[in-house]
Amino acid sequence: MSTFDAAPVALIVHAHPEPQSFNTAQMATAAQALRDAGYRVDVLDLYSDAWAPVLGREEFAPVEGYFKPQAEQQRAVEEGTLDAAVEAQLDRLLAADLLVLSFPLWWFSLPAILKGWVDRVFVMGAVFGGDHGLFGDAALAGKRAMLLFTTGGPGESFRPGGAIGSMDDLLFHIHRGMLEFVGYQVLDPVITYGPARMTDQERAAALDTVRESVALVAAGPRPAVD
């Protein structure tokens, strides 16, 4: 097996509409840190790719009567009729040893385009349910995932007793309800607080911190190679 084949794969799913944003610069910094550590990095830019986030009945074979999205996902997996765009994304997801969700924190959660990616690509019957279980028995067990994001507010707002409250509490629905649910080991998030309020020098220092934080992630345990 070649060194290239043996390299772990990181999939970065990026969701920011502005290519010149600090958030996008943060994603690029993280991607380079992973490459420097020997990862093959696959970057999926949802806005650039004009990803359609809505999970609807039109992407499935005709359904008579009541439409249940997850049941139709599982049927599409079993019958080999998944929407081509979804199947391509699913293949990239399953090939990755590390998933990085890169985004600005909007309304204390994921931007709609990224939540829609999860809705459509975390396919029932392919990553959980059907022949797979949940959590430790789901299809992505043994793989790692992390959040890489920016906030509008300062760090002190996201602490226990702060104006917003504990960041751990805020992220529970993503960490537990999305990532751990399909089997991932969830790593500590990499967060830049309030970059819009920083000077250029402070933003440069923040990117250095991101680089160092992601390098530590990359240096952590990696999946065994057959």
Predicted regions and their residues:
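N-terminal beta1-alpha1-beta2 submodule of the flavodoxin-like/Rossmannoid cofactor-binding fold
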Residues: 2-127, 205-226
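Hydrophobic/aromatic beta-strand patches that form the interior of the parallel beta-sheet core
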Residues: 11-13, 42-44, 146-148, 187-190
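Short, histidine-centered active-site or binding-site loop motifs used for metal coordination
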Residues: 14-16, 152, 191-195
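Flexible domain-boundary/linker segments
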Residues: 27, 58, 116, 134, ...
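Pocket-edge positions in alpha/beta enzyme catalytic cores
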Residues: 78-81, 137, 198, 202
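Structured loop/turn residues at beta-strand edges in well-structured enzyme cores
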Residues: 94, 140, 184-185
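Short, glycine-/small-residue-rich phosphate/pyrophosphate-handling segment
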Residues: 127-181
